[in-house]
Amino acid sequence: MSLFRRAEGWWLAAWLGLSTGCVGLITQAALAQVGPSPSEAAALTGLHAAAHRGDTAQIEKLAAAKADTNAKAGHGRTPVHVATFARQRDALKALAKAGADLNVLENDRYDAVTIASVADDEETLRVLLALGASSKQTTSRYDGTALIAAAHLGHDGVVRQLIQAGAPLDHVNNLHWTAVIESIVLGDGGRRHQATLKALIDAGANLNVTDRTGSTPLQLARARGYADMVKLLQAAGAK
């Protein structure tokens, strides 16, 4: 099961107040973001196919022949999206050199930075950010950010990169959650989610933004029995 499919299942289940036993059903039903299937990949043509293969010579050849570097294929994906899913970093560099837009949103409103962040693909994310891709876009049906998605999944290395790149720390999505809140309510309280929360605290994230019910991050961590997260929040002065 893809990380996007799992992630969106948790998001929707939590929003609807469902038990964890229902998450699997929601997960299957959610319209989730997944990379090209083998059959979809085999059907790619032109720059999309070259991006999927990591064929930089073909990318350069097609770009020189004025191929549209931002052309959209299935699901509204550009060659940049395809290369990101396939972890083809040299292809991303070639596409950027040819003038491709690194910040295009596909049909489900995901950009390359969010795709790499959810995949916990720190190397591809590092390349994208170095090429000038934005960490600040509002993405997904939840009006979230790459940082919120990464915090939700406990991708602490990704979170640190995004913070360094200037991602908005206190963005509130349409579930009324911030990255801090998602690291708690959609996390497992374990090592990586603790490291994620610590990175957000160290960066100066607001620890007192409440969720839709008026609960603070500290109250949410206490309610879940996440003692180590409670300690982190209390040490940082959370109320």
Per-region residue spans from a language model:
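Bacterial N-terminal signal peptides
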Residues: 11-24
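Intrinsically disordered, low-complexity regulatory segments in ankyrin-centric signaling systems
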Residues: 22-65, 74-77, 235, 239
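Ankyrin repeat boundary/linker residues
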Residues: 40, 73, 106, 139-140, ...
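Start-of-repeat signature of ankyrin repeats
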Residues: 43, 76, 109, 142-143, ...
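Ankyrin repeat A-helix N-terminal signature
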Residues: 49-54, 82-88, 115-121, 149-155, ...
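Ankyrin repeat structural motif
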Residues: 55-63, 88-96, 121-130, 155-163, ...
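Ankyrin-repeat inter-repeat connecting loop/turn
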Residues: 69, 102, 135-136, 169, ...
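Leucine-rich solenoid repeat scaffolds
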Residues: 208-239
